[in-house]
Regions:
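Sec-dependent N-terminal signal peptides
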Residues: 4-13
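Mature catalytic domains of secreted/periplasmic carbohydrate-active enzymes
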Residues: 20-434
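Sec/Tat signal peptide C-region and signal peptidase I cleavage site
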Residues: 15-19
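Positively charged n-region of N-terminal signal peptides that target proteins for export
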Residues: 1-4, 91
Length: 434
C-alpha cells in the first residue's frame, strides 16, 4: 500500500482516464456490482515474505534491501500455522462477505503457483503450497467471495519499470524492459482468472508509483479488457487515488471514508460506482511486530456503519503473522464485529446510503420503507434528523423494538431518544409512509 502523500500530475490523469474506452459492463458485471454493494464488509489480507521481517509490507524499499538478499527470505518461509479453513471461518463468523488477498505485493513475490516465475510460494519456499488456491477454495466452500490484490509495481524483477519507490533494491537499470514486464503481468492475471474459479475482483495498486513520470502508460486498457474478457463478472478496482477510469467497476478509498480526506490520499470526487474504503485494524497493512495499536472494536463498528451510511463497503485489513496465524488481537476484534452484525446486520447488509448526508452525530442507511438512523456520537436526549417529504409512520429503537416519541414538521423529524444504551451505535428504525 502507498504510504506517502500522492501528488499526481494532470498528464498522468489524462493518460489513464480512458483505461478501457467505451466500456459497457455486461449484465453479469452489473449483477456482481450489486452483490458487492450488498455485502458491505470484506477482509483485506497483506501477507508475504515481508511478514518474516516484522516491519510491514514496505520493508524492502524502506530499508533499501538488495533484491538478491531479499529473495533469500523465501528459503525461511514455512508458515506451519497457516490454516485456510480457520482463517475463513473467522472471517465468516465476523460477518464478512468477501476476502481480498495479496497475490503479489510490491516485493514481487507471488503467493500462488505461477509458471511465469520460480519466485513464488509453491516453488521457492520449504512450505511448497499454493496459498491462493487453498484460500480461494475455502472461501468458496464457506460462501465468501474471493478478490485478488495485484501490484503493478515490482521491486524484485529486473525488467520492471522503475518508479519513485524501490530505487534502492539494487536492480540493474539497463535490464528494465517494460514490454517484457507487461507480458509477465498479463500472463499472471490470466493464470489467476483461469485457474482459481470465479474471482470477485482484481484489486490493483501502484499506479501512483509513476506520478513523477506523467507520460508513463500502465496499459490499463489491456489489463481491464483481459479481465472483463476472461471473467465478465469480475470487478476491476484500482487504488490509484484518482477519480475512476473507464473500465473500472468499483471506486476505492484508502484509509478514509468516501468524501473524506484525513489521510491525504482520498481527495478525489466520489463517483456513482459502488464504493469501498480500505482501513487497517492497527496502523499497518503487513505484519509489524511492534504495532500493537489496534483500534477498539467499537471504533471499527462505527467505521463500518460510517461506510454503509455513505453507500460504501468496509475492507478491513489484517496482517497475518510469519507463522501463518492471525494475530490474537485481530481475532478478538473480528469476534466483536461479528457479534454486533448478528444483532444489527439488517441495518448494514443490502442497504443504500440513507436520505440524510453524514452528520456529526452519525449516518443513515435505508432499505425499502425503512430508514435506519445510526447515532454514533450524540449526547443529548433529542435528535433532529432533516428528513423531508415522506411521513414517518413509526419510530423505534432497533435493539429492543421500543417505540420512540417523535414529532415531524416540514423541516424534518425530532426523535426523543431517551437514555442512550451502551454500545457503539444507537440505531433508530423509522418506518416511512407515503
Amino acid at each position: 500500500m502507498k504510504k506517502l502523500l500522492l501528488c499526481c500530475c494532470a498528464a498522468l490523469f489524462a493518460a489513464n482516464a480512458s483505461a478501457q474506452p467505451a466500456y459497457e459492463p455486461s449484465p453479469e458485471n452489473l449483477a456482481a456490482r450489486q452483490r458487492f454493494a450488498d455485502g458491505r464488509f470484506g477482509i483485506f489480507l497483506h501477507w508475504g515474505l515481508y511478514a518474516l521481517l516484522g516491519q510491514g509490507e514496505w520493508v524492502m524499499t524502506n530499508q533499501d534491501i538488495d533484491y538478491r538478499e531479499y529473495e533469500k527470505l523465501a528459503g525461511a518461509f514455512c508458515p506451519a500455522a497457516f490454516d485456510a479453513k480457520a482463517w475463513v471461518t473467522a472471517f465468516r463468523e465476523a460477518g464478512a462477505r468477501y476476502v481480498c488477498f495479496t497475490t503479489r505485493h510490491h516485493d514481487g513475490f507471488s503467493m500462488f503457483r505461477t509458471a511465469q516465475s520460480p519466485y513464488n510460494v509453491a516453488d521457492a519456499t520449504p512450505f511448497g503450497r499454493d496459498v491462493v488456491k487453498e484460500l480461494a477454495e475455502e472461501c468458496r466452500r464457506q460462501g465468501l467471495g474471493i478478490h485478488f490484490y495485484y501490484s503493478l509495481i515490482d521491486w524484485w524483477r529486473e525488467d520492471a519499470p522503475r518508479g519513485r519507490t524501490g530505487r534502492g533494491t539494487g536492480r540493474p537499470a539497463e535490464k528494465e524492459d517494460a514490454e517484457a514486464y507487461f507480458g509477465f503481468m498479463k500472463a499472471q492475471l490470466t493464470e489467476l482468472l483461469t485457474q482459481y474459479g470465479p474471482v470477485g475482483a482484481i484489486w490493483f495498486d501502484g499506479v501512483w508509483d509513476q506520478d513523477e513520470n506523467p507520460g508513463f502508460d500502465w496499459r490499463l486498457d489491456e489489463l481491464y479488457e483481459l479481465i472483463h474478457t476472461l471473467q465478465p463478472a469480475c470487478l476491476v478496482v484500482n487504488n490509484h487515488h484518482l477519480t475512476p477510469f473507464e473500465g473500472e467497476d468499483v471506486q476505492t478509498f484508502e484509509r478514509d471514508l468516501p468524501g473524506e480526506n484525513t489521510a491525504g490520499l482520498s481527495g478525489q470526487a466520489v463517483s456513482r460506482l459502488p464504493l469501498e474504503t480500505c482501513q487497517t485494524m492497527n496502523g499497518s497493512w503487513g505484519y509489524r511486530i511492534t504495532d500493537l495499536s489496534y483500534k477498539p472494536t467499537d471504533e471499527l463498528v462505527r467505521y463500518l456503519a460510517g461506510a454503509a451510511g455513505r453507500g460504501g463497503n468496509l475492507l478491513l485489513n489484517i496482517g497475518p503473522q510469519p507463522d501463518g496465524a492471525l494475530p490474537a488481537a485481530a481475532l478478538e476484534r473480528l469476534a466483536g464485529i461479528g457479534a454486533w452484525l448478528r444483532e444489527n446486520g439488517e441495518t448494514i447488509y443490502g442497504t443504500q446510503a440513507g436520505p440524510v448526508t453524514p452528520r456529526a452525530w452519525g449516518v443513515t442507511t435505508r432499505r425499502g420503507d425503512k430508514i435506519y438512523i445510526h447515532v454514533l456520537d450524540w449526547p443529548d436526549a433529542e435528535l433532529f434528523v432533516p428528513i423531508r417529504g415522506k411521513r414517518v409512520r413509526e419510530a423505534k429503537a432497533f435493539a429492543d423494538g421500543r417505540r420512540l416519541e417523535f414529532r415531524q414538521d416540514e423541516e424534518g423529524v425530532t426523535l426523543r431518544l431517551g437514555e442512550r444504551p451502551a454500545g457503539p451505535d444507537h440505531i433508530v428504525e423509522l418506518t416511512m409512509g407515503k
